[in-house]
């Protein structure tokens, strides 16, 4: 599933091609995504793109009369292509631009979404979200304060979008390893020092992944069609049974909150 770094990589990749350009019209080949493609999108005509923003794992395309909200779901990706490039089986939505390019949305599993909002402040999918992990609002003091009396296990707790957005399964695993914190401890056991280290580590892991173009494990591609390269730097995620890159002990895997969790029992405590 594309997580925050992959969505931010997509945003940065499409921004130079869309901002200041005009969407002539949209082509919707299959509108049966997680939610039906918004009617406002299907009726787009000659709309100037003002900005491309991101909130959590949602891409926000600002137009004069509203916002296109895109979620990549489990297997979605966005590419900038020539208009004449034929669509393939899983290419469901195109935004046809005035300069002859298209923004093409590909989603084999169709769990993504193309929504519309006239007012982001009243948009239900963006309500009740926690702070952005790369913002100043997310820090060790915030994390330590929120962990007080929390019996939830640390890893599922980190993945709660009401606590902080965008720390998905890959990056929760990697951040906890780098911070030397066992993923199945109750959140309330975090010390103040650990909370500060964990907040700092989450920022560094996410930023490094963004710099490397995200993590491609299966379907994700950058806007130019290239994979993300952070997968080559993973310490624990997807490495059950392999030796730890730090100590050589075997990486273990358990289920927490119905999600696969990877850790090194020697390096994390």
Swiss-Prot record:
One of its GO terms (molecular function) is class I DNA-(apurinic or apyrimidinic site) endonuclease activity. The active site is at 2 (schiff-base intermediate with dna), 3 (proton donor), 57 (proton donor), 259 (proton donor). DNA binds at residues 90, 109, 150. Its EC number is 3.2.2.23, 4.2.99.18. One of its GO terms (biological process) is base-excision repair. Its cofactor is Zn(2+). Binds 1 zinc ion per subunit. NCBIfam families: fpg, PRK01103.1. Monomer. Involved in base excision repair of DNA damaged by oxidation or by mutagenic agents. Acts as a DNA glycosylase that recognizes and removes damaged bases. Has a preference for oxidized purines, such as 7,8-dihydro-8-oxoguanine (8-oxoG). Has AP (apurinic/apyrimidinic) lyase activity and introduces nicks in the DNA strand. Cleaves the DNA backbone by beta-delta elimination to generate a single-strand break at the site of the removed base with both 3'- and 5'-phosphates. HAMAP family: Fapy_DNA_glycosyl. This is Formamidopyrimidine-DNA glycosylase.
């Amino acid at each position: 599933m594309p997580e925050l770094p992959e969505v931010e990589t997509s945003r940065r990749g499409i921004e130079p091609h869309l901002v200041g350009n005009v969407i002539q019209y949209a082509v919707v080949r299959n509108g049966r995504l997680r939610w039906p493609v918004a009617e406002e999108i299907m009726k787009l005509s000659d709309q100037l793109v003002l900005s491309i923003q991101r909130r959590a794992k949602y891409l926000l395309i600002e137009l004069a009369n509203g916002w296109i909200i895109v979620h990549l779901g489990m297997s979605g990706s966005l590419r900038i292509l020539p208009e004449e490039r034929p669509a393939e089986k899983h290419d469901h939505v195109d935004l046809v631009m005035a300069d002859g390019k298209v923004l093409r949305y590909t989603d084999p599993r169709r769990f993504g979404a193309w929504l519309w909002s006239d007012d982001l402040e009243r948009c239900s999918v963006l309500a009740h979200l926690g702070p952005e992990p790369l913002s100043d609002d997310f820090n060790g003091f915030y994390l330590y304060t929120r962990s007080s009396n929390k019996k939830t296990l640390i890893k599922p707790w980190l993945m709660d979008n009401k606590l902080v957005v965008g720390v998905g399964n890959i990056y929760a695993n990697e951040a906890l390893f780098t911070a030397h914190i066992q993923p199945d401890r109750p959140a309330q056991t975090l010390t103040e020092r650990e909370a500060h280290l964990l907040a700092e580590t989450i920022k560094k892991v996410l930023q490094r992944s963004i710099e490397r173009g995200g993590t491609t494990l299966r379907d994700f591609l950058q806007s130019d069609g290239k994979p993300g390269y952070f997968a080559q730097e993973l310490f624990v995620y997807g490495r059950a049974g392999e030796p730890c890159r730090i100590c050589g002990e075997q990486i273990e895997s358990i289920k927490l909150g119905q999600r696969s969790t990877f850790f090194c029992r020697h390096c994390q405590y």
